[in-house]
Structure formats: structure tokens, C-alpha cells
Curated annotation (Swiss-Prot):
Enzyme Commission no: 1.4.4.2
Gene3D superfamilies named among the record's database cross-references: Aspartate Aminotransferase, domain 1, Type I PLP-dependent aspartate aminotransferase-like (Major domain)
Gene Ontology MF terms: glycine dehydrogenase (decarboxylating) activity
CDD domains registered for this protein in UniProt: GDC-P
Full protein name: Probable glycine dehydrogenase (decarboxylating) subunit 1
Subunit structure: The glycine cleavage system is composed of four proteins: P, T, L and H. In this organism, the P 'protein' is a heterodimer of two subunits.
Gene: gcvPA
Superkingdom per UniProt: Archaea
Catalytic activity entry: N(6)-[(R)-lipoyl]-L-lysyl-[glycine-cleavage complex H protein] + glycine + H(+) = N(6)-[(R)-S(8)-aminomethyldihydrolipoyl]-L-lysyl-[glycine-cleavage complex H protein] + CO2
Organism per entry: Saccharolobus islandicus (strain M.16.27)
Family: Belongs to the GcvP family. N-terminal subunit subfamily.
NCBIfam families attached to this UniProt entry: PRK00451.1 (NF001696)
GO biological process, one term: glycine decarboxylation via glycine cleavage system
Keywords assigned: Oxidoreductase
């Protein structure tokens, strides 16, 4: 009888093989070509099951390889470090939320549905949008769903996307639209301001097949797009849908997308109470204005409020015929429950901050990021490639290769910015970067540059 060192209940394998009339596992997998089968033992762990003590010892050895940084990481690219109030962790750690998710008889879980309804309401107020779903996987998947949604609504095949939008989000979109016949056309940005090139936008939009126009606010370089309302007008003129990707914390300072009549809004709730953890988990935000042609095509779940037969208020999933409750090929998406727990974390975070707290936090981030940029550009031959105003993230150009600077920072247990080119890096500064941390970054870089220039 076949034995496997890792899987329990293996006596059942013989019973199952006998039931289906197959003599062995080799016979069962006979249709798989021999050249792609692995005919050797895999080098898994120690080659045998480990005891609890051995597993704990192995993990601790790996943990020792972690480097404790002297300051919060200065790398962002859309995923930035923020302080998370302990009450956020406490509430989502409660078993009612942490071990549960919306079941397929969702009305049984009234508490969870109400929490998600509160998330939708708070996010709708923040964005000034009418309808928000109960969450997506992340910004990239939300943007991809927005592109697919636009195609379903108007049947057009070309989507205009800025070159200065987050490249990681664009890669997700390209993956999701593969085989759909949808074309991504990139719009250039002004190399001096860092903002979208309006002339190129007019040129690229001069066709009848525009399904949607996307713009990110602030853009990938952290720069505020001052002409965003003009972009929305271009989309209206072309009878295309406007999609706005927005940094949620920046809304403490700038106008929300609903105020300039965006059709679809996407973003990421990572900024609102979620940790950094190998890039996840993230929490995609998806909102639309009040138009049933949009609402009916929204991906994801929507929690609504109603009354039962006794007149009591209750919460329910609404418009379920859009979702995976119907045939998969007819559903607008199959996103399922996804990031419900993290949506609740967002709701708790927003409730704690309130309007004034959001503004104060956004101002803190704005001033700290500008302080860091100012101190860095005081170093000889260090400059900013773009002249426009920015929030949280900013690009810095150096007189020496950034790889050398990055290596020096790592030696000092500092995580620098994201390399954009040989001499340019994108830095991130938030409320967790105090003056001491910023000054340490600046002095280390200055020492590195001065040492190279004098050698």
C-alpha cells in the first residue's frame, strides 16, 4: 500500500482506488505524460514530519535572519507604513469578526452585515460617492474590475491609462483583461511637472472606441493632478466612463472624487488601519455614483438595509443576481467575501479619526513628506525631477547611482525608496517618520554622496 509521510488517513486511498476500479495511484495518473512527473522524493523540510518543538525551533532560526530597521521604511509605491491604533486590532481580533465571514445564508449574520454596512456608509461619505461595495482584494483588482465593468456597460474596447499611474496596478489590469480584447492605451505625462500630459490625452482620446479613462490622484510619483476635473470632462465628452484611483488619506486635504462627478472610484484601504505584511493583505475600495446601469454592473457584494415581514430593521445582501449566486459565467464578478475583516478595520479606523482627525493626519503627512524632500534637496547636486505639489511620496534625483545609496542605507539598517531609474528613487514619508528618522536618512545619504565625490 502507498504510504505518504505527510498526509493522514492514507488507508482511505486504497478504499477510494478500489471504489473507482483503479489498482494504483500510478494507474490513476497514467494520463499525465511521464516527462513531467517527478520520480523522486521532494526535499521538504528535514525529509520527515517535524515535532512541534522542531517546527518552533526551525521558525525561530528563520526569524533571527530578520533585520530590525533603525527607522520605518521609506519605500512606498502605494503601500506605506502607518500607525494602527490598538483599538482597531482589538475589535477585528474579536471572534465574531476574526473567525467568521459572510455565509451563504448571510441574513443570519446580522452583526457582521451591519459592520460591513457601516464600512460602506463611511467610505461613501469619505469619497462623496453614492454606492460602495463591501470590499475588493486590493487597488489593482478594483481597477481591473472597473475596466471590465466599463467594457460590459458600453461595449467599447480601449481604456486610456496614464503612464504616471502605479505600474503594479497596471500589470494587474493587463493580466485580468487578457483574452477579453480590451486594449490599454497609455497617456504620457509632462516630464517637468510630473502631471498628465493634456495634449497627449486629447490626441489619444480622439477615437470613438474609448471605454474608460483612468486617472490616479495623487499619481504614482505622489503628485497632485491639478487638471483632474478636465480629465473627467474629456471622458464625458467621449461618452466614456471616468475611473479615479485615489489615495484615501489625501482626502483629508483635497476634494473627494464625487465632487467632480467621477463615475467609478477605486483605491486601497491599506492606509486606513492595515499593516505591512509582505505586501498584504490589502483591501480594495470600489465605489460608483448613483446610476443603476453602474450599480447593476458593480463587482463584489453590497450590503443593504431593509425591513422584515414584522417591520423590524434588518441587513441583507442586495442585488445578488449580479454576483456569484447565479451562474459563474453570468456573474459580474466572483469576488466573494474576500476582505470583509479588513473592511471592518477600515470602518473602525475611520470612526476613530472622524473628519477632523482625517484632516490633521493628512496635514501631518503632507508637512513631514515636504520636510524630508526639502532636507534631501539641500544636499549638493540632489534635486526633485518634478516641480508640482505632492503628498506622502516624492521622487528624488541623485548625482550618483541609487544602487550605491541603497546599499549604504541597508548597511545602516535603513530601507530607502523604490528605484525608478539609475539615479532616481521614489521615497515615502508618513506620520510614523519623525524628524529623527528623516534626519538620519538625510545624513546617511549626504555622507555617502560626499564620500563618493571626494574619493
Amino acid at each position: 500500500m502507498y504510504k505518504h509521510p505527510w498526509l493522514p488517513n492514507l488507508d482511505l486511498i486504497d478504499e477510494m482506488l478500489k471504489e473507482i476500479g483503479v489498482n494504483s495511484l500510478d494507474e490513476l495518473f497514467n494520463d499525465i505524460p511521464a516527462e513531467i512527473k517527478i520520480n523522486r522524493l521532494l526535499n521538504v523540510a528535514k525529509g520527515k514530519p517535524l515535532s512541534e518543538y522542531e517546527i518552533e525551533k526551525e521558525i525561530n532560526e528563520k526569524v533571527k535572519k530578520n533585520v530590525e530597521l533603525q527607522a520605518p521604511p521609506f519605500i512606498g509605491a502605494g503601500i506605506c507604513p502607518h500607525y494602527i491604533p490598538n483599538v482597531v486590532k482589538f475589535i477585528i481580533g474579536r471572534s465574531e469578526f476574526y473567525t467568521s465571514y459572510t455565509p451563504y445564508q448571510p441574513e443570519i449574520s446580522q452583526g457582521l452585515l451591519q459592520a460591513l454596512f457601516e464600512y460602506q456608509s463611511l467610505m461613501a461619505e469619505l469619497l462623496d460617492m453614492d454606492v460602495v461595495n463591501a470590499s475588493m482584494y486590493d487597488w489593482g483588482s478594483a481597477l481591473a474590475e472597473a475596466v471590465l465593468m466599463a467594457n460590459r456597460i458600453n461595449g467599447k474596447k480601449t481604456v486610456l491609462v496614464p503612464e504616471n499611474a502605479n505600474p503594479f496596478h497596471k500589470e494587474v489590469v493587463r493580466t485580468w483583461i487578457g483574452g477579453k480584447g480590451i486594449k490599454i492605451e497609455e497617456v504620457k505625462y509632462d516630464k517637468n511637472s510630473g502631471e498628465l500630459d493634456l495634449e497627449d490625452l486629447e490626441k489619444k482620446s480622439n477615437i470613438d472606441d474609448i471605454s474608460a479613462i483612468y486617472i490616479q490622484q495623487p499619481n504614482f510619483f505622489g503628485i497632485f493632478e491639478s487638471n483632474i476635473e478636465h480629465v473627467i470632462d474629456v471622458a464625458k465628452h467621449k461618452r466614456a466612463l471616468s475611473i479615479v484611483g485615489v489615495n484615501l488619506l489625501s482626502l483629508g486635504l483635497i476634494k473627494p472624487p464625487g465632487s467632480y462627478e467621477a463615475d467609478i472610484v477605486v483605491g486601497d484601504g491599506q492606509e486606513l488601519g492595515l499593516p505591512l505584511n509582505f505586501g498584504g493583505p490589502l483591501m480594495g475600495v470600489f465605489a460608483v455614483r448613483w446610476d443603476m446601469s453602474l450599480v447593476r454592473q458593480m463587482p463584489g457584494r453590497i450590503v443593504g438595509i431593509t425591513k422584515d415581514t414584522n417591520g423590524k430593521m434588518g441587513f441583507t445582501l442586495i442585488l445578488q443576481t449580479r454576483e456569484q449566486f447565479i451562474k459563474r459565467e453570468k456573474a459580474t464578478s466572483n469576488i466573494t467575501t474576500n476582505e470583509a475583516l479588513l473592511a471592518i478595520a477600515n470602518a473602525v479606523y475611520l470612526s476613530l479619526l472622524g473628519k477632523e482627525g482625517m484632516r490633521e493626519l493628512a496635514e501631518e503627512i503632507y508637512f513631514r513628506s515636504h520636510y524630508a524632500a526639502k532636507k534631501l534637496t539641500e544636499i549638493d547636486n540632489v534635486s526633485m525631477p518634478f516641480r508640482s505639489d505632492f503628498f506622502e511620496e516624492f521622487a528624488i534625483r541623485f548625482p550618483i547611482e541609487y544602487d550605491k545609496i541603497s546599499n549604504k542605507l541597508k548597511e545602516r539598517k535603513l530601507q530607502g525608496g523604490l528605484k525608478l531609474s539609475d539615479y532616481t528613487s521614489l521615497f515615502c514619508v508618513t506620520e510614523v517618520h519623525d524628524k529623527k528618522s528623516i534626519d538620519l536618512l538625510v545624513s546617511t545619504i549626504q555622507e555617502m554622496i560626499n564620500g563618493v565625490e571626494t574619493s
